[in-house]
């Protein structure tokens, strides 16, 4: 990647992307908000009622809680007033675990329902009739609930581990309190008591985690029911500790546990119920155990479904309502009651028999919970307890007899019936019908038939149904499954018939699909509809109690494998009454419809993204035997079925367009259905067609009853119906992002359509095909609703991808700046709007921003395709389930076409989000800086201390290092690393503001200060995008701090958030930047590549893994901070010597602080030397030659000194001495001249090294004594920022030109001929002009007491030196302690170095004085500067001496104390000597100073390089 031409950029492109992205975001957000209306879903939950009371048991936990968590959390026992007789425990324990920010009081809905189903409502403790035979103290559940202080467990794995640890301690306490009873073989309490758990949201994760902790009570937790729990992956992937928890609980089970029959190896029964589409707080996809492949090796250990599939509810439920929804709480409460009633509470008995076979109690407990939840067919996700067919031992395994599921042995009664006579099983009359197994019509038809029976009659009392207390009801319909076997008593021709009764729990409750009654239909109009009529009520409705007998329909389905396994020969249906009791009370007509159907017999045809479903031409060829009275005489099946393979998706919403057949339309126009019709008319229409669409992998389903609605029938009879399709929305949970793809045997959508055969009778006078109630069903994609579903699943996109794009753009800018450090480092806004990127194969013909986004999108799409290929090829990846890293890459989809369409859209939205964030923050800093400056607060935010030059050896400030060590040590001992990250964020915020204020104050080289500000701002931008990951945890930590203090509980997670490495690199980098300097360029290609690689790693993790593993972006940024800190440290340690970039060693990158900025300018870059080819020693010397990098103490000149543009200073320009190299500039460039120059160079180099070492020793001694003086006087009286601005200059520079004719040195830079010679001497300043003041020189003043803006400090009045002409532009604001005085009264005078050319110096004289000037105009009453001659000043001073008393001369030490200490005076002496030796002041030989020697080395180096270049050119010419 190289720098592209700025002229080819389209500056409007970022804003165009912003407009397009805002359109996409608006479209998606609008779809998300209107998602329930678009999908036709609404929450239909009845409100639950209860009388709660809580009894605190926390004090009893202390002996069972060695971790000390009993001080942090609490345990309560729930009691329902007016039902439960006493507050003491009376039954079996059950525990409720709240979720993220959940309350312990959420248990009241389920616990209240359990009490109301078990006790009568009088408070006497009397049981209901169905529980009167239950063992005492077993069946009833004592509900305990845990108070987790409403912790945010979704954001912290540490919190989850602490909660799981406390759950284990509570279970140990409850097992001890509810000790098992004594038996003949065991003493009391010898066997473990099980404690089933009900958990909401993240509480389910904590409950599952208990088995992986050291204090887990083995065998005491055998049932975990979870509500809206994200089992597959974390809902908020901001913390690596949460991912660690998920990796523990989702580890596949060992093969030994699958085959073991030991009770200790039996996993807990895990029941997962998800809320569905209305749960927008947490997507319900990860709640599917089947789709996540959790526990699929032991299918009987799991149940997974959605609330929309639960009978009597059939509604999606939001995240909170899943706890109080009345229809759901009745099922859950009854499931716990039945579980304890049937299997007791002793752990060994409940887990006996292993995990498979008829003896497995686990299978029986699963069957009980399936019945309690009323799960049938595809609603029991993952193929029920069978599991995926890919994992079955063999195809014949399904037909084995031990596959029969039951709760109690012989629960389905069987009896013998004669084969002839009136009581024969084959006898048929008007109320009794026999359905024989259809004959095989071909080899392909084997096993394709299934039996369907639908009725609204009562089929018996079902106590195992989880729909509240069962209502007494008569048996109005009986179904028997009969088998004919040879009779042993009559071996010749005798047959014996054995029939098994179909029990009530085998019937599935389905929604009612009423056909409009014609007598009522004729009385109503479209404007006046009676909503109280059953056929006019919406579905589902919270006001309807569907499980009341006679309202909803009952369905019996007998699949082919069940009929084969039980060897059924025929099915006998006996109707006990003509009209049902409950049906008649509602004014409805009783009906029974049954018949055979072929499974998955429909035809599919794909049209682009749409799918067309039609009937198979041969699907109506069915064999019905003796079905008179129940079914029509035609051979039309009662149901049609389509299987859509690979059609499952959670991201796509669809529209169903159903076209009714003409036969159905004609029959709807002619049928007759009367109210309260008690007669038996088997051929009359009885119910409206209805449909169900379900996903076999997840168990999610959607019912569409009453396809022939009253409005449609009304239009048909009015002849206004024109054949328009009936439209319904559809969205199911299926294959989802970051989830394993569904198994092939489960990856299907099933569409089922039921039709009353009476509505498909031949129409008199018309020849119409009457094979089906619909001509076609079209499924098409609803793109608007799909946008809302995509937004629901990819909400964390904005937490990762903007950071990735920012990192890539800043990395490109950093690489370019490293190559060309003479350019300022670009701002973040410039980096993202004008990225330095060259599009491969196209170059500058495409805008760099467009090329960058396009290349990123193509790379991600190709990477996603490679990921899919690897996942399908690696069996180990599929075995890992949701923990596979391949699933979490990019978008985590298993459809490459979907990824290719979404990735460009996501990139545009991410870029627009980044653009808005960066622009707002960058503009906000400008606004804040303006406000701070306006109110005069800038000086309070000034840098503390002085940042030394880049060429200085890296020195360590003890106080700063101590603070850094304490901060890092606090991470280990006291606070989590997230808290320190927040501190570093705030510190970097302050650093960035300081850098901007200094940039606006114009106190230093603008290029370096601009680079520093942009670097600080770039790092801050990345910290801003990372802040949400850590701020979420801090909320939990602060809450815990308020509740239990700083003490950490004794758990395995005690030190998870106290890892020093999680924050140390960020702390070090921000600490380095807090010193007031910018980060140095790379010294070598290796370092440059390392920095670019660090930014690339952040971009890689953010774009590739950022959505699923967001926390990895923080780890990548940590590594980037480490690389930046190490490279900066190496550059500082070596004086920022870079042989990677050519010719920029002496650029303006030296001083970056208020204290030293502007003191000396850089030499300027060398134009003729290739440093990359120079020896290391020569390069090291040249890197240190820039006088701007010489170690000059910050007290040598005031911090406000800022060189003027256009002037000359001691430290600026390439000074040269023509006399030294005069001979080297001649035309004759022989080898003797070159040897002579090299010898001279080595001699000067030796003198330079000795002079510099001596200067360093003096500086070290002076600083040591200054430190001792600080200890003696105190930091408040002697600080690093102190400087008496009233002092005059004590340094005089003499610039002379020996000969203008000799000033032209061949090959030397142009500026070298301007200054012939520089000599520096220290002089005694003349303070006589101060003797006219009325005040003493040194006077303590309180700035807050100064009342007038025109008063000056201590009455001083400054005059300029002789011959110096000043203008208003020569004056700058003072710096130091009095900068930005609030009242403008204390303004420091500043020293101005004046740059004078050789010609000017010769005309004015041989001496130029650097002196002080008065403050800016407007800050003093003497707004005009007095420029006088020396004689005038002497006259004036003479007059002063006659009238005024001579004041004390100013001294640098008097500002620190009235009587300076010996250490302070010693420091002054040493530092003054060091400065003299550095500048060559008071030296008899003008060339002995470090400055002069460095300049001579510079000239000699340039001359030698020029001679080499000239010799090389002459050699080439001679060769030619």
UniProtKB/Swiss-Prot annotation:
Record-given protein name: GPI inositol-deacylase
Protein's membrane topology: Multi-pass membrane protein
Any matching Pfam family: PGAP1_TMD
Keyword Protein biosynthesis in record: no
Purpose: Involved in inositol deacylation of GPI-anchored proteins which plays important roles in the quality control and ER-associated degradation of GPI-anchored proteins.
TM helices/strands, residue ranges: 13-33, 796-816, 846-866, 886-908, 915-937, 966-986, 1018-1038, 1052-1072, 1087-1107
GO cellular component, one term: endoplasmic reticulum
Subcellular compartments: Endoplasmic reticulum membrane
Species per Swiss-Prot/TrEMBL record: Mycosarcoma maydis (Corn smut fungus)
GO biological-process terms attached to the record: GPI anchor biosynthetic process; protein transport
Record: glycosylation sites: 122, 192, 1214, 1253, 1297, 1387, 1513
Keyword Protein transport assigned: yes
PANTHER family reported for this sequence: GPI INOSITOL-DEACYLASE, NEGATIVE REGULATOR OF VESICLE FORMATION-RELATED
């Amino acid at each position: 990647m190289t720098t592209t031409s700025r002229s080819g950029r389209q500056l409007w492109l970022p804003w165009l992307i912003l407009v397009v992205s805002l359109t996409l975001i608006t479209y998606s957000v609008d779809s998300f908000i209107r998602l329930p209306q678009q999908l036709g879903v609404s929450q239909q939950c009845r409100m639950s009622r209860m009388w709660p009371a809580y009894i605190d048991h926390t004090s009893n936990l202390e002996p069972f809680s060695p971790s000390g968590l009993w001080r942090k959390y609490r345990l309560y026992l729930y009691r329902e007033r007016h039902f439960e007789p006493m507050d003491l425990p009376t039954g079996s324990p059950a525990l409720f675990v709240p979720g993220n920010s959940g309350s312990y009081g959420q248990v009241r809905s389920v616990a209240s329902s359990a009490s109301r189903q078990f006790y009568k409502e009088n408070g006497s403790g009397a049981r209901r009739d169905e529980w009167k035979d239950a063992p005492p103290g077993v069946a009833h559940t004592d509900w305990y609930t845990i108070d987790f202080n409403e912790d945010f467990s979704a954001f912290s794995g540490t919190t989850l581990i602490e909660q799981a640890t406390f759950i284990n301690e509570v279970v140990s306490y409850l097992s001890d309190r509810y000790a098992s009873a004594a038996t003949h073989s065991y003493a009391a309490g010898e066997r473990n008591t099980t404690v089933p758990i009900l958990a909401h949201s993240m509480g389910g994760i904590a409950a599952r985690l208990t088995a992986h902790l050291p204090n887990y009570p083995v065998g005491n937790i055998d049932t975990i029911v979870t509500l809206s729990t994200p089992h597959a992956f974390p809902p908020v992937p901001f913390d690596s500790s949460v991912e660690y928890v998920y990796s523990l609980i989702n580890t596949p089970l060992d093969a030994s546990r699958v085959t073991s029959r030991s009770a200790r190896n039996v996993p807990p029964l895990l029941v997962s119920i998800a809320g569905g589409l209305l749960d927008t707080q947490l997507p319900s996809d990860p709640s599917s155990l089947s789709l996540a492949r959790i526990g699929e090796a032991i299918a009987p250990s799991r149940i997974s479904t959605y609330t929309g599939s639960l009978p009597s509810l059939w509604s999606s439920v939001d995240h909170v309502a899943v706890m109080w929804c009345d229809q759901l709480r009745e099922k859950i409460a009854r499931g716990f009651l039945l579980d304890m009633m049937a299997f007791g509470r002793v752990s060994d008995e409940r887990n006996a028999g292993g995990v498979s076979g008829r003896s497995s109690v686990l299978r029986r407990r699963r069957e009980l919970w399936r019945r309690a939840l009323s799960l049938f067919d595809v609603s029991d996700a993952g193929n029920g307890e069978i599991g995926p067919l890919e994992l079955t031992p063999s195809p014949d395994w399904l037909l084995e007899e031990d596959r029969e599921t039951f709760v109690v042995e012989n629960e389905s009664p069987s009896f013998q019936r004669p084969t002839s006579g009136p009581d024969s099983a084959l006898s048929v009359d008007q109320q009794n019908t026999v359905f024989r197994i259809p004959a095989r019509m071909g080899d392909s038809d084997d096993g394709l038939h299934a039996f369907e029976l639908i009725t609204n009659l009562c089929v018996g009392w079902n106590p195992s149904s989880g729909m509240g207390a069962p209502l007494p009801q008569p048996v109005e319909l009986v179904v028997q499954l009969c088998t004919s076997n040879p009779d042993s008593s009559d071996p010749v021709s005798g047959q014996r018939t054995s029939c098994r009764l179909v029990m009530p729990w085998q019937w599935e409750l389905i929604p009612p699909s009423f056909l409009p009654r014609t007598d009522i239909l004729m009385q109503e109009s479209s404007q006046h509809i009676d909503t109280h009529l059953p056929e006019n009520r919406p579905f589902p409705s919270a006001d309807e109690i569907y499980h009341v007998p006679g309202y909803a329909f009952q369905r019996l389905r007998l699949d082919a494998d069940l009929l084969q396994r039980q060897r059924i020969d025929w099915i006998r249906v006996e109707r006990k009454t003509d009209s049902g009791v409950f049906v008649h009370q509602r004014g409805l007509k009783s009906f029974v419809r049954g018949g055979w159907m072929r499974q998955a017999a429909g035809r599919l045809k794909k049209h682009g993204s749409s799918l067309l479903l039609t009937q198979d031409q041969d699907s109506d060829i069915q064999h019905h035997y003796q079905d008179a009275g129940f079914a029509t005489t035609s051979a039309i099946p009662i149901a049609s079925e389509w299987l859509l393979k690979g059609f499952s998706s959670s991201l796509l919403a669809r529209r169903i367009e159903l076209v009714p057949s003409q036969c159905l339309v004609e029959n709807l126009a002619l049928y007759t259905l009367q109210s309260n019709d008690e007669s038996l008319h088997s051929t009359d229409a009885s119910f409206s067609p209805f449909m169900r669409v379900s996903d076999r992998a997840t168990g999610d389903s959607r019912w569409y009853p009453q396809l022939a609605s009253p409005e449609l029938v009304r239009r048909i009879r009015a002849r206004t119906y024109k054949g328009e399709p009936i439209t319904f929305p559809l969205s199911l949970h299926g294959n989802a992002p970051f989830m394993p793809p569904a198994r092939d045997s489960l990856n299907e959508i099933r569409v089922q359509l039921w039709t009353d055969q009476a509505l498909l009778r031949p129409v008199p006078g018309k020849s119409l095909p009457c094979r089906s109630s619909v001509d076609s069903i079209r499924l098409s994609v609803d793109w608007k609703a799909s946008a809302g579903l995509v937004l629901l699943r990819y909400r964390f996109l904005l937490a990762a991808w903007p950071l990735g794009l920012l990192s890539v753009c800043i990395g490109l800018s950093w690489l370019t700046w490293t190559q060309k450090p003479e350019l300022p480092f670009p701002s973040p806004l410039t980096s993202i709007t004008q990225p330095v990127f060259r599009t491969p194969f196209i170059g500058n013909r495409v805008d760099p921003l467009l090329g960058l986004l396009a290349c990123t999108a193509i790379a991600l799409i190709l990477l996603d395709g490679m990921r899919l290929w690897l996942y399908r090829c690696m069996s180990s990846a599929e075995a890992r389930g949701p923990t596979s890293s391949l699933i979490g890459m990019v978008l985590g989809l298993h459809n490459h076409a979907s990824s290719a369409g979404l990735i460009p859209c996501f990139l545009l939205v991410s870029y627009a989000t980044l653009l808005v964030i960066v622009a707002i923050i960058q503009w906000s800093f400008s606004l804040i800086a303006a406000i701070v400056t306006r109110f005069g607060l800038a000086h309070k935010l000034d840098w503390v201390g002085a940042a030394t030059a880049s060429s200085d050896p890296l020195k360590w400030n003890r106080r700063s290092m101590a603070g850094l060590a304490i901060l890092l040590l606090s991470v280990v001992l006291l606070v989590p690393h997230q808290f320190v990250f927040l501190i570093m964020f705030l510190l970097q915020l302050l650093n960035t503001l300081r850098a901007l204020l200094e940039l606006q104050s114009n106190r230093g080289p603008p290029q370096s200060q601009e680079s520093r500000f942009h670097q600080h701002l770039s790092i801050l931008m990345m910290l801003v995008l990372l802040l949400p990951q850590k701020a979420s945890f801090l909320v939990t930590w602060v809450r815990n701090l308020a509740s239990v203090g700083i003490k950490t509980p004794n758990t395995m997670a005690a030190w998870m958030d106290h890892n020093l490495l999680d924050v140390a690199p960020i702390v070090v980098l921000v600490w380095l930047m807090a010193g007031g300097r910018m980060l140095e360029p790379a010294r070598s290609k290796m370092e440059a590549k390392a920095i670019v690689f660090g930014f690339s790693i952040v971009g890689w993790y953010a774009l590739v893994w950022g959505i699923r593993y967001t926390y990895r972006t923080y780890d990548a940024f940590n590594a980037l901070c480490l690389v930046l800190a190490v490279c900066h440290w190496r550059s500082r340690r070596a004086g920022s010597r870079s042989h990677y970039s050519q010719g920029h060693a002496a650029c303006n990158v030296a001083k970056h602080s208020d204290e030293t900025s502007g003191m000396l300018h850089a030499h300027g870059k060398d134009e003729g030397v290739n440093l990359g080819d120079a020896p290391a020693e020569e390069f090291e010397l040249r890197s240190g030659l820039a006088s701007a990098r010489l170690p000059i103490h910050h007290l040598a000149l005031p911090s406000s000194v800022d060189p003027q543009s256009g002037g000359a200073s001691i430290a600026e320009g390439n000074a040269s001495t023509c006399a030294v190299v005069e001979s080297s500039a001649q035309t004759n460039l022989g080898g003797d001249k070159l040897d002579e120059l090299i010898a001279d160079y080595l001699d000067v180099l030796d003198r330079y090294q000795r002079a510099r070492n001596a200067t360093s020793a003096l500086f070290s001694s002076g600083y040591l004594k200054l430190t001792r003086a600080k200890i003696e006087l105190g930091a408040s009286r002697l600080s690093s920022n102190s400087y008496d601005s009233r002092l005059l200059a004590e340094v005089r520079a003499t610039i002379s030109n020996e000969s203008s004719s000799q000033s032209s040195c061949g090959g030397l830079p142009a500026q070298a001929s301007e200054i012939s010679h520089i000599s520096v001497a220290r002089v005694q300043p003349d303070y006589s002009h101060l003797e006219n003041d009325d005040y003493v020189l040194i006077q303590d003043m309180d700035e807050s007491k100064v009342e007038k803006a025109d008063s000056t400090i201590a009455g001083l009045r400054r005059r300029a030196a002789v011959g110096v002409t000043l203008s208003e532009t020569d004056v700058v604001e003072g710096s130091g302690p009095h900068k930005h005085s609030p009242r403008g009264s204390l303004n420091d005078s500043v020293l101005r170095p004046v740059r004078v050319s050789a010609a000017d110096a010769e005309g004015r004289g041989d001496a130029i004085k650097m002196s002080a000037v008065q403050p800016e105009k407007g800050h003093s009453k003497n707004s005009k500067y007095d420029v006088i001659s020396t004689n005038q000043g002497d006259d004036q001073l003479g007059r002063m001496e006659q009238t005024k008393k001579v004041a004390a001369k100013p001294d640098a030490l008097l500002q620190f104390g009235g009587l300076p200490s010996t250490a302070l005076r010693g420091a002054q002496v040493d530092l003054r000597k060091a400065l003299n030796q550095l500048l060559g002041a008071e030296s008899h030989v003008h060339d002995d100073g470090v400055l002069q020697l460095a300049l001579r080395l510079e000239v000699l180096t340039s001359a030698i390089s020029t001679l080499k270049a000239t010799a090389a050119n002459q050699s080439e010419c001679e060769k030619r």
